[in-house]
């Protein structure tokens, strides 16, 4: 049954890709890459949401070679566009006159030091680049070169995991989360946002690596928490319950985590569990208001 759905979704996706409003952009980028004798792909969230039939305006292009050189020529061919180059990271972004932004990066492999989530990068293959992605559903790519235009490259079964509504990492989850602990928050955010389940091994790896969230800046943590806060009702309650169950909340907002009186002496059946009561208040409020600061106050 899931396989049938996956097959239907795959052919529907290809049809949608050919009809997408960004088709001319993709064709243009593919032609530039062909002229430079480089392979290029649209990757990540755009591909995921194309399959899920969800809107996504984030266009990320991976070039096996220099992403900057393709971006520069793309800018030259589009009048009134602006080009931003980040040479240190080998990335570039072109903002078109209609405000569509396309980001370019050269395919790369990454390695990490234990005390930092900032990777050491070196040029790599498409597979290297897909291996460094956080989850299989974000590791898919669609080729833009003319001879393979529209071909899906899915080495880790991202389409299948979408069909099974499952969040799983493309490599050992313990390594994935130890290398970049922010991915643990992203994992919960995607699970809540998409209504997916987290793979058991992936879930266990979050618990085992929860303490590693301490090496992530508070600013980056707040960005992810605020994205979870944008959910509503039971989804929002589920998000914070998952943060608590994985012990991430214990390291991020220990005061909130300590509100859970489950199993604490003197609280059995005598008092309302303040933590889960607070989650219910938060969920109810989120159905009435999108004000993120009002939600935090709850």
List where the protein language model places each region:
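Extreme N-terminal basic, low-complexity initiation segments
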Residues: 2-6
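Catalytic cores of the polymerase beta-like nucleotidyltransferase superfamily
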Residues: 8-298
């Amino acid at each position: 049954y899931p396989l049938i759905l996956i097959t239907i979704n795959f052919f529907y996706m290809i049809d949608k890709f050919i009809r997408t409003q960004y088709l001319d952009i993709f064709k243009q980028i593919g032609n530039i890459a062909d002229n430079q004798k480089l392979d290029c792909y649209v990757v990540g969230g755009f591909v995921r949401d194309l399959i899920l039939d969800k809107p996504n305006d984030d266009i990320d292009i991976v070039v096996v070679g220099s992403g900057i050189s393709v971006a520069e020529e793309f800018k030259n061919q589009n009048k009134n566009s602006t080009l931003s180059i980040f040479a240190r990271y080998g990335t570039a972004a072109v903002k078109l006159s209609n405000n569509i932004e396309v980001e370019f990066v050269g395919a790369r492999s990454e390695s990490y030091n234990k005390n930092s989530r900032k990777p050491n990068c070196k040029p790599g293959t498409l597979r290297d680049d897909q291996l460094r992605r956080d989850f299989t559903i974000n590791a898919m790519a669609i080729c833009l070169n003319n001879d393979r235009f529209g071909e899906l490259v899915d080495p880790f079964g991202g389409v299948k995991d979408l069909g099974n509504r499952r969040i799983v990492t493309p490599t050992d989850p313990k390594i994935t989360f130890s290398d970049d602990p922010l991915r643990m928050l992203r994992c919960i955010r995607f699970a809540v946002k998409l209504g997916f389940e987290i793979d058991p091994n992936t879930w266990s790896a979050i618990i085992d690596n929860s303490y590693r969230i301490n090496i992530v800046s508070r600013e980056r943590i707040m960005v992810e928490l605020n994205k979870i806060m944008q959910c509503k009702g039971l989804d929002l309650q589920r998000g914070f319950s998952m943060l608590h169950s994985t012990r991430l909340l214990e390291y991020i907002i220990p005061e909130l985590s300590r509100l859970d009186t489950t199993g604490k002496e003197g609280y059995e059946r005598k008092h309302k569990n303040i933590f889960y009561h607070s989650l219910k208040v938060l969920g109810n409020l989120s159905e009435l208001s999108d004000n993120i600061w009002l939600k935090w106050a709850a």
